[in-house]
Amino acid sequence: MDTELLKTFLEVSRTRHFGRAAEALYLTQSAVSFRIRQLENQLGVNLFTRHRNNIRLTTAGEKLLPYAETLMNTWQAARKEVAHTSRHNEFSIGASASLWECMLNAWLGRLYQLQEPQSGLQFEARIAQRQSLVKQLHERQLDLLITTEAPKMDEFSSQLLGHFTLALYCSSPARKKSELNYLRLEWGPDFQQHETGLIAADKVPVLTTSSAELARQQLSALNGCSWLPVNWANEKGGLHTVADSATLSRPLYAIWLQNSDRYSLICDLLKTDVLDEQ
């Protein structure tokens, strides 16, 4: 049996709502419904009764619940044990390309400088979309996630690392938004809410990317503008803020599993300020 089906079943039974379960699992609601149907087809029974927003476990669902919890706990324990024996002194940190380029690269350098030579700690820097990294964190395939969005799942712990400032930049001075093409740099799903109020609704991006460096290099060629971290843009030089634009403050969070066996190490690493250069 696919453990993802059981995990979805447990989340729906916990929230009693397909939409909230989908949000917690970072899936679409249709994907959650499909997984539940798959599980019901495999078992040959209905697991939930569905009446509008009133979702309840059937008798069969109630009977499955303790077994599903036991199976998932056993599976997680097995994954943890196998991962522990294979990883030794490896520690994995995940973030988007832009965060690595603009601030985490410098932080990683400081971590290496502060490590005791005999510690033998090896870092793995992973670059991926937030949704993929959250899944890896949940499945114990990732130790620490750095992101601009607070966690939505109860089993995650987090620490607010601070804030950094974004500004709208272009490659030449005294330019207005209406004169420039828009290059969308992905700063997280919730950033789109702010973006809507700061960029004209009919402004279709000529480029969408998760790399700040790529966006910066394309500003001149595409006659474009993009939201970039102020300190990083100042370090790079040759960039100018768009005349009729504002600045925007963004939070930065460290996220890990509540019961992570790397908790002590995480606390030690986070003593080194991630935003020290920001």
Curated annotation (Swiss-Prot):
Keywords: DNA-binding, Repressor, Transcription, Transcription regulation
DNA-binding annotation, residue ranges on this chain: 18-37
Disulfide bonds: none
Keyword DNA-binding: yes
PANTHER family: HTH-TYPE TRANSCRIPTIONAL REGULATOR HDFR, TRANSCRIPTIONAL REGULATOR
Biological role: Negatively regulates the transcription of the flagellar master operon flhDC by binding to the upstream region of the operon.
Stated family: Belongs to the LysR transcriptional regulatory family.
Protein name: HTH-type transcriptional regulator HdfR
Native source organism of the sequence: Salmonella dublin (strain CT_02021853)
